[in-house]
Each structure stands twice: as structure tokens, then as C-alpha cells.
């Protein structure tokens, strides 16, 4: 009965709305003009007649939710001319007139209305903060969305990405090869250039190249690197990882281990490249930096470039903005489980399990996601059988530049070591800021989906745009007792979203490498940032060795170690809410 009811509801909604989680095979039939209130699309295609399903959907929405019909009738852009795009026809056939809109939110009522409308229309929510929400949809659906929203939201949005197919096209490597692509048969290159100047981190890399690169590193640096297997994917692929560390012989103590994972969501390519960059920097710095050498003697590091190889490969071969894994669901046309909503701790899939087409579908049961279950079993086996003590977990995602600590599922319980979690998170944010002057916000993971009390001017937080139970962050922290667990959302703040240009790979990697160095220093019991190797070639900004004071020259809140380029930098407008004392490590651990 449950399955029948689910299919009945989905059948009705399928007639009323396009499903965002399904590749848009018919998207090139969508009209190309925006709704009222969206006047920033530069050039649009001539208006196409509405299809039968589109007209039926609009009628259902108008009658059930009382959408004013004029929103669908008086749409601008009828005189627009078709621009000359360089994106191939195959991409335009898949993504049609998809755009990304940013809605500015001001109160709880607006957030609730936006969340409900997104669920009704099966829209793809790209990111959300306490100030804005980014949503991907076709221009043809904009009138339906606006009709479900209050008047204030109908005018408080801007198009963030005007032309999704073009932006997707530009995210694939490589620009030098694009001229040879057949416009009618575009396929992104999966072969890395042999040019020595086109090094590994100058572009995003497909999974096959990443695995080959990992094996190469293992053979070149066998003294402190080995490749391991976390488990198998739904489609039978290995989930490879790099284990980095100097393993002492005959040591009965549990080996302290840090896990850095990326690519749970397939479309978040920058997280995959960043995991690789940090791993490479630690590996190659071992013989150059005494601080890195000390770190690898004290800790093992496990780097998992992508927990979701099936989905990652799918983003290269079929759909660049695919989010979930590729396993089967109860609806054959809606495959995939969200690998960051399927973990066993505070799994809330009983609320959303009826909609396999949702981008956040958690599966029908806890650990329904094959790769998440494999990862959890591997982690448990390591602690039970291999004398491993996990001391930190960093789960890299994109985008919005946030550092989040537990809990994700709710703001009501405070973590027992909340003060230490905040202290380390603030230290990581400072290291990032001093690397490339990028600002990352620090908050509990639940607050990442809600407005702060200061913004809401109330003790009641904003409602959630999407469910956040069943996260890897909460499971590692609570069930595996990993005291320092973080989810870090990388660059950018929405200009490109998941389609971050390749020029950001190295600077983002530099920021996270310094973040990991701060993490290691914190776990080692050191004060301040004295062991950050700013003179190391893997990090930025650069300074002469003589410019870095020794550890005993550093005071608790002394910033004299900062490279000369930043010593006179005005911090007043950065890191709002944190004074200079709050940025320093304040030695207040509670064990």
C-alpha cells in the first residue's frame, strides 16, 4: 500500500512538474524566457509554445495553490534573439534553459515558503545560508515557483548563473582541446595532457586518472604512503584511499588517525581535487619540512578523494551536476541515494523516504547508501581490529565557504566539547584567511541551514530548507566518538557554485593544506600557529625562512609569525564577531 500510494502521488506530480533529479532529456523544448521579477537574463531564445504537460502542470498549480494566472501569461523576453553560444548541442539538449537563482531570505515565513515550494516542484537546492538560498530550475518553471511564494520573495531574487549549459561546458578540461570537439557530439576529455607544464592540479581529473596518480605516488613514496581500499561501490568499483604516515614498529598504542574525505556528492569536483592536493602536499613535504615529518610520525592520514566513484564518473560521462550515488531505488527513473543523508545516527529518512526523485533522498533505511555503509564498516573494523584511534574527521564539500561542526540534525543538543570544536574551527578559518584572504564562516552544522538569532531577532531559528539528519559528520562524532569532526564547504560563495573554474584548484588546496597543518598542531597540543610552514612551496603566502620566528619567540596571541605581505593587513572587516584574542588558540581543552 505504501508503495502504491507513493507511486500514485509521484505520478500526479510528474504530470504537474519536471523532476529536477532526472536528466532533462526533453529540456530543449522548454521556453527560454524568465518570469516577472527576473530581468537580468542577458539574451534569451524566442518563445516556444508550451507543451501539453507544461500547460497541464501550470493549470494544476494555479488551481491547487491559487497561483495568479497572469504570472504565466505576461512574461518578458518574447523579442529576445538566440545568441551564439559555444556550448555543444548535446549539453543544451540535456540542460536546456536551466539557470540558478539566488533568493534573499529575511524571515522564517519566507524560508518556510521557499522550502515548501521547492519540495512541491522537486527543485534542486544548490546551497543555503542564513541569508540566501540558491536553486537550480528551468526558466519555464520560474513562474510556477514565484506563484507559490509570498510577494516579498517574488522580487528578492537574482539569476546567479544565467546559462547553465555554457557554464558546465567551461568546467570541463581542457580549453586547448575544445576546438577539436565535434559540436554535435561533445564528450569531455578523460585523457590528461602529456605536456609537463600541464600538471595534475591545473585541471580537474577524471577518476581513472586519479587512481593512476594515486598508484604512482605509492610507488614513488613507499616509505610513508600506501594505497588502501575502503570498500566497493554499488556498480562494483573500489573506493581507493591514500594512507600517509610513518608507522613505528612494535608500538602497542592505538595509532591516532585523521580521515579527510571528499566527493560524497558527485558534482562537487573541487572537494575531490582538494583532497588530492592536501595529500600530495603532505607526501612531498615529508622530506622537506620537519613539521610535516613530525606530524606524519604522530598521526596517520587517510585521504579519500571520492566516496562516490560511480557518481563522480557519471558527472564526467553523462550529467555534470549529478549529486547522488548511482544505486537503484524503488523508482527506476529516479536512481541514487544522497550519501550524506543515509548515515545511521539520527537518520530522518522516514520523512523523505517516499521521494526517490529528491536530490536529498536518504534511502528507505539507515545506511541504505551502499558506499556510506561500506565506509562505516571499514571505520568500525579499523578501530576494532587494526588498533586505530580516529581523532579527527574532515568531510569536504562545496560550496559557500563554511566550517561546520556537530550537530547537523538539530541545534538543541550541544556537543560535549563544543568549546574545543569552536576553538579549532576558528583557528582553521584564520589559517585559510591568512593563506589567500578568503573568509570562511564558522558555525554548528545545524545553523548552516538556519538564520542566526541575531539575524532573526528572535530565539526561534529559521526552519530548514532541507533535512539534515543522517550525516557523516554526526555519525563520526557521535557513534565513532571522533572528537574533532568537521564538514567544510569549500569555494566559492555562489558565483560558479559547483562549477568552480580550474583556476581555484590550487589556491583552495593551499587553504586546506594549511587548515590540516593547524588541525595537526592543535591535536599535538601546541599553541598558536608557529608550526605553519609558510616558507614551504606547497603553501602561500611565501616567506623567507629567517622571517619565521621559532616557537619560543611566539606569544599566545602574537601575530609576528605572519608573512610580511600580511603583517600590515587590516583585519577589522574580516571575521566579523571575532576579535584578535578569539582568533588565537586559548589552551582550554577539557580532554
Swiss-Prot record:
Q: Does the keyword Iron apply?
A: no
Name any cofactors this protein relies on: Zn(2+)
Q: Where is the composition biased (Acidic residues)?
A: 544-559, 573-582
Q: Which residues form the Peptidase M14 domain?
A: 203-523
Please indicate if the UniProt record lists Glycoprotein as a keyword: yes
Q: Which family does it belong to?
A: Belongs to the peptidase M14 family.
What does this gene product do? Inactive carboxypeptidase that may play a role in cell wall organization and biogenesis.
Instruction: State the name under which the record lists this protein.
Output: Inactive metallocarboxypeptidase ECM14
- Tell me which species this is from: Paracoccidioides lutzii (strain ATCC MYA-826 / Pb01) (Paracoccidioides brasiliensis)
What is the taxonomic lineage of the source species?
Eukaryota, Fungi, Dikarya, Ascomycota, Pezizomycotina
Amino acid at each position: 500500500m505504501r508503495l502504491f500510494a507513493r507511486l500514485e502521488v509521484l505520478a500526479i506530480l510528474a504530470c504537474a512538474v519536471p523532476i529536477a533529479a532526472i536528466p532533462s532529456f526533453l529540456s530543449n523544448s522548454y521556453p527560454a524566457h524568465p518570469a516577472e521579477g527576473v530581468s537580468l537574463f542577458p539574451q534569451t531564445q524566442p518563445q516556444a509554445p508550451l507543451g501539453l504537460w507544461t500547460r497541464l502542470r501550470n493549470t494544476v498549480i494555479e488551481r491547487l495553490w491559487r497561483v495568479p494566472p497572469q504570472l504565466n501569461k505576461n512574461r518578458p523576453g518574447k523579442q529576445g534573439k538566440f545568441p551564439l553560444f559555444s556550448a555543444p548541442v548535446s549539453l543544451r539538449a540535456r540542460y536546456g534553459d536551466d539557470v540558478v537563482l539566488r533568493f534573499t531570505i529575511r524571515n522564517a515565513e519566507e524560508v518556510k515558503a521557499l522550502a515548501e515550494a521547492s519540495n512541491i516542484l522537486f527543485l534542486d537546492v544548490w546551497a543555503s545560508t542564513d541569508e540566501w538560498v540558491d536553486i537550480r530550475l528551468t526558466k519555464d518553471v520560474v513562474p510556477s515557483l514565484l506563484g507559490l511564494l509570498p510577494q516579498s520573495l517574488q522580487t528578492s531574487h537574482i539569476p546567479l548563473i544565467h546559462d547553465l549549459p555554457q557554464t558546465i561546458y567551461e568546467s570541463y578540461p581542457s580549453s586547448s582541446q575544445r576546438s577539436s570537439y565535434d559540436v554535435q557530439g561533445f564528450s569531455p576529455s578523460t585523457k590528461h595532457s602529456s605536456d609537463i607544464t600541464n600538471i595534475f592540479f591545473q585541471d580537474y581529473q577524471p577518476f581513472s586518472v586519479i587512481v593512476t596518480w594515486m598508484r604512482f605516488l605509492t610507488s614513488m613514496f613507499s616509505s610513508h604512503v600506501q594505497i588502501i581500499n575502503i570498500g566497493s561501490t554499488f556498480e562494483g568499483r573500489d573506493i581507493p584511499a591514500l594512507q600517509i604516515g610513518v608507522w613505528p614498529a612494535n608500538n602497542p598504542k592505538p595509532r591516532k588517525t585523521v580521515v579527510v574525505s571528499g566527493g560524497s556528492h558527485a558534482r562537487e569536483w573541487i572537494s575531490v581535487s582538494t583532497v588530492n592536493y592536501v595529500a600530495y602536499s603532505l607526501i612531498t613535504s615529508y622530506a622537506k619540512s620537519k613539521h610535516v615529518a613530525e606530524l606524519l610520525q604522530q598521526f596517520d592520514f587517510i585521504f579519500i578523494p571520492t566516496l562516490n566513484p560511480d557518481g563522480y564518473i557519471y558527472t564526467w560521462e553523462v550529467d555534470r551536476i549529478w549529486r547522488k550515488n548511482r544505486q537503484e531505488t524503488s523508482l527506476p527513473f529516479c536512481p541514487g541515494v544522497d550519501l550524506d543523508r543515509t548515515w545511521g545516527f539520527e537518520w530522518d529518512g522516514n520523512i523523505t523516504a517516499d521521494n526517490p526523485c529528491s536530490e536529498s533522498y536518504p534511502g528507505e533505511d539507515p545506511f541504505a547508501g551502499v558506499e556510506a555503509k561500506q565506509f562505516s564498516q571499514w571505520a568500525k573494523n579499523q578501530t576494532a581490529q587494526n588498533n586505530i584511534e580516529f581523532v579527527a574527521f574532515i568531510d569536504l564539500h562545496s560550496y559557500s565557504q563554511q566550517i561546520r561542526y556537530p550537530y547537523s540534525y538539530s541545534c538543541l543538543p550541544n556537543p560535549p566539547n563544543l568549546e574545543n570544536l569552536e576553538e579549532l574551527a576558528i583557528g582553521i578559518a584564520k589559517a585559510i584567511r591568512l593563506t589567500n584572504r578568503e573568509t570562511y564562516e564558522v558555525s554548528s552544522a545545524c545553523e548552516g541551514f538556519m538564520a542566526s538569532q541575531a539575524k532573526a531577532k528572535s530565539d526561534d531559528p529559521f526552519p530548514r530548507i532541507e533535512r539534515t539528519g543522517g550525516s557523516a559528520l554526526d555519525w563520526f562524532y557521535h557513534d565513532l566518538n571522533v572528537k574533532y569532526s568537521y564538514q567544510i564547504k569549500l569555494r566559492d560563495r555562489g558565483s560558479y557554485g559547483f562549477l568552480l573554474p580550474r583556476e581555484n584548484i590550487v589556491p583552495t588546496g593551499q587553504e586546506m593544506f594549511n587548515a590540516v597543518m593547524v588541525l595537526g598542531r592543535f591535536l599535538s597540543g601546541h599553541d598558536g600557529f608557529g608550526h605553519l610552514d609558510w616558507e614551504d612551496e606547497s603553501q602561500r603566502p611565501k616567506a623567507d625562512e629567517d622571517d619565521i620566528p621559532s616557537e619560543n619567540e611566539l606569544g599566545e596571541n602574537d601575530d609576528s609569525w605572519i608573512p610580511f605581505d600580511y603583517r600590515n593587513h587590516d583585519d577589522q572587516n574580516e571575521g566579523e564577531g571575532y576579535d584578535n584574542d578569539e582568533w588565537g588558540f586559548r589552551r582550554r581543552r577539557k580532554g
